[in-house]
Amino acid sequence: MEPVTKWSPKQVVDWTRGLDDCLQQYVHKFEREKINGEQLLQISHQDLEELGVTRIGHQELVLEAVDLLCALNYGLETDNMKNLVLKLRASSHNLQNYISSRRKSPAYDGNTSRKAPNEFLTSVVELIGAAKALLAWLDRAPFTGITDFSVTKNKIIQLCLDLTTTVQKDCFVAEMEDKVLTVVKVLNGICDKTIRSTTDPVMSQCACLEEVHLPNIKPGEGLGMYIKSTYDGLHVITGTTENSPADRSQKIHAGDEVIQVNQQTVVGWQLKNLVKKLRENPTGVVLLLKKRPTGSFNFTPAPLKNLRWKPPLVQTSPPPATTQSPESTMDTSLKKEKSAILDLYIPPPPAVPYSPRDENGSFVYGGSSKCKQPLPGPKGSESPNSFLDQESRRRRFTIADSDQLPGYSVETNILPTKMREKTPSYGKPRPLSMPADGNWMGIVDPFARPRGHGRKAFVSTKMTSYMAIDGSALVPLRQKPRRKTQGFLTMSRRRISCKDLGHADCQGWLYKKKEKGSFLSNKWKKFWVILKGSSLYWYSNQMAEKADGFVNLPDFTVERASECKKKHAFKISHPQIKTFYFAAENVQEMNVWLNKLGSAVIHQESTTKDEECYSESEQEDPEIAAETPPPPHASQTQSLTAQQASSSSPSLSGTSYSFSSLENTVKTPSSFPSSLSKERQSLPDTVNSLSAAEDEGQPITFAVQVHSPVPSEAGIHKALENSFVTSESGFLNSLSSDDTSSLSSNHDHLTVPDKPAGSKIMDKEETKVSEDDEMEKLYKSLEQASLSPLGDRRPSTKKELRKSFVKRCKNPSINEKLHKIRTLNSTLKCKEHDLAMINQLLDDPKLTARKYREWKVMNTLLIQDIYQQQRASPAPDDTDDTPQELKKSPSSPSVENSI
C-alpha cells in the first residue's frame, strides 16, 4: 500500500468524494488548491477555514476522517497491545504526577476553587484517549474470546466512565483530584498486572495488511460479507456467509478492517459509498484488509460459527424495499443508504434449522418436531453443530424489525451505559464517548445518528440493528413479502397493559430469576404472570400498563428446573434463544403452570407451525435503576384459572415495534423471512389489513369505536396517538381530519364484524371499560392537545417540547409539514431578531457614523443578507418610491445610504 504522505492531489480528491454527503460541496475546493497527501495529514481547523469549510461540524467530520488516515499511516507498524498498555500507564502516571506537584505548590487553591485548571482537564482527556486506543484493540478478535482480556476491558471502561463523571461534578477541585487519584491508581495496577502476568506473544504483535482477491462473482450472488461501520467511517468485517465468495477465499475473518477496495482507500468513507465501490466491478473485487494478530492461546479466527445453515443457492429474488421508521430522525440520504446495502448480506437461512437435543440425545418435550430421527454419533454431540447447543444456552438472540438494516453482528453482555466504538486516534486526543463493549448483544442502529450533526453526543447502544446467535455467529436476513394472516398488529408485545389482556388461560404470582443477579441482592423477583393462548406475559403488578417481559411459546420447551436451588422452579427454554426460569409458591401451583404451559406449546405447534418465536423483556433496562419489592404474599390473591385457550391471538393496540429495552423481540430462525416482512402501517393500511384478515376467517380483536362528536375526537386521538407529535396535537388534528375524512364520512363506527364466540366476552369487557373511562379519554385528549378543561391553550412544558423533536409521525407527508413548520418558525425568529437589531440602531438618538461602522462590522452577515435581498427584489421605477420603500422595509440597504 502506498503511504498516504505520497498521495497526489488527484488521490486526495478521489478520497474526499467518498466522505459524508454534506462534505461533497467542498471537493472542488480541495481540487482547486491541489492538496497532496502530506498536506492532508497535517490539515487543521485554520487550514479548513481558509479552504472555505466554515462550519465547525463539517470541519470535525473532515478531521475525524483524517485522524483515521493518520492512524493508518503512522501507527500500523508500531502499535501493538503492549505499547498501548504502556501508553495508558504513562498517561495515568503523568496525571498522577501533575496532581502531586500541583498540591505541593504554595499557590494551591484546590480547597477553595471549584474550577479545575485547563492542564488538569487536558491530562484527563489524554488519559481517556489512551484508554480508547487500548479498548479498540480489546474490543476485537482475538482478544474478545479471552476471559482475562474481557475482564480487563470491562474494568477500564468502568474506570474511564468514573473519571469522566468525576471531572464533570460540581465540587471542590481537591475532592475531584482525590477521586481522580483513586481511579488512576487502579488503572496503574491494571496496566502493571497486564504487562507482568501476560506472556502471550500476541501482546507484542502488530497489525498487518493483506490483499484479498474475490474473483468470479456470479450475478446476484453478492460477496457474503457482514460489515459494521463506526460513526466516523471505519469499516469492520464482522463475519462471512458460508460458501460465499468471501468465505471461499479463506482470508476474510471477523475483526478485519476494510482499508482499500480496488486500490481505492475507503477509510473514513460513508458505508453507502463503500458499497458502491464494492459493486463497481461486477466480475471481481480486490480488498486490502487490516488484520489484528491471531496467535493468542491457540486462537485462529474462523469465518464464523454460522455453519448451521446449508450452502445457499444463488438468489434470484429482487432486494426488498425498506419502510420508514416512525421514530427515525435520519435524513433521506441515510434511508437510501439502507436499501443500497441489502444485497451485501446474503443469503437467507433455510426454512428448517437443525434441532438441538438434550444430554441423552433425544428431543426435548415441547421442542421443534420438524426433525424426528436422531443422527448417529457420540452421545451429547450427535449433530454436526452440537457445539452450538452449549453456546446458545448462555447466549441471547436478537433480531431487528423490518425497517432496520439486516445482517450486522454483535456480541454479548452489554454494559448498561451509553457508549460507542472509536478507533485509536493518533495525535491530538478528541473527547469522544467510550467504545462499545466487545462481548455484548444488543440492538444499535449505526445510521440512527446522522454524521453531519457532529460527534460529541453519546449514542445509545439500543439503536443498532444487529443479529447474532453467539459471540461470532451471524445469520443473514432477507425480507420476503408475506400476507399477514395473524389477527394482531405488529408492535411490541409488551405494550399491552395487564387490564387489556382480558380473560387469561392461567394467571398468578410467580418468581422470575434475574439474568444478572448481584452478589448480595435477591436473584428472584416476583411478577404477575399471565398466560393467554401461546403468549406468556409478566407484569410488575396487576395494574401495570406495560409488560416487563413477553414470550411467544411455540418452539420453546417447558420442564422442571432441577439445576436451580429455588424450590418449585421450572424453565421455559429455547436452545437458540435463551432460558427463562420461574418458580411457584408450592407444588400445586407449579404443576398447574407446567400443565398449562405444556398444553399451550403443544396446541400452538399443531395449529400454527409458522408462528414466530418471540422473547421480549425489560429486566435489564437501564431506566430501571432500583427494583420495586414485590407485594407481601399475604396480600397477593392467587387467581390461577383453568380455561381453554381461545383461537384468537393476543390483541395489540399499536402498529410499531418498541425497542426500548436491551432485550428485544426475538424470533426463531425458521420464521426470519416471514417476520421481517411486517411493515409499519398507517391507519388506512391497518383497516385494510384487518379487512383482509376478516375475509380469510381469521379472528380479529382490534376495534375502533366512534361515539358522540366530542368522544370521537378522543377516539381519533387514541387511534392515531403513535402517529403524531404530542406537543403539536393542535396542528395535527387539523391535518388528521383530512387524512381520516374518507373513513369517517363512510363509517360512523369502525368495527370488525363476525368475531368468534371466544372473543365476544373480551369485547364486552373492553366496551364496558371504554364506556366507564369516557371522561378519562376526553381529559387525556385535551391534555395531549395542550388544552385546559375549559378549552384554553396551556403552555407546553419543557418535557413536551423535547418529545416533539424526538417523536416522529409515521405519515411522511405530515412529517414534512411538521418539519416545514419548525423551519418556518425558526426562520421567523431569526428574522424578528434581525429586525429588532435594525430597529435598535435606527432608534438610537446618539447614532454616529463611527457607531454605525462598528455595528456594520459586527453584523456583516446581516448586511450581506440585506444586499442579497436587494438584488433579488425588482428595482423601483421612480425615485419617488424610495421613501415608501424605507417605510415598508426598514432593513433595506437604503437605510445604510441614508445614514
From Swiss-Prot:
SMART domains, sorted: PDZ, PH, SAM
Domain SAM: 7-72
Native source organism of the sequence: Homo sapiens (Human)
Feature: compositional bias, Polar residues: 663-676, 889-899
GO biological process, one term: positive regulation of cellular response to hepatocyte growth factor stimulus
The protein, known as: CNK3/IPCEF1 fusion protein
PROSITE patterns: CRIC, PDZ, PH_DOMAIN, SAM_DOMAIN
Gene this chain is encoded by: CNK3/IPCEF1
Known function: Required for hepatocyte growth factor (HGF)-dependent activation of Arf6 and HGF-stimulated cell migration.
Region listing for Disordered, in residue ranges: 309-334, 347-390, 605-687, 735-770, 868-899
Positions of the PH domain: 503-602
Domain PDZ, chain residue ranges per copy: 211-293
Pfam families: CNK2_3_dom, CRIC_ras_sig, PDZ, PH, SAM_1
Domain named CRIC: residues: 80-174
Species lineage: Eukaryota, Metazoa, Chordata, Craniata, Vertebrata
Entry's family note: Belongs to the CNKSR family.
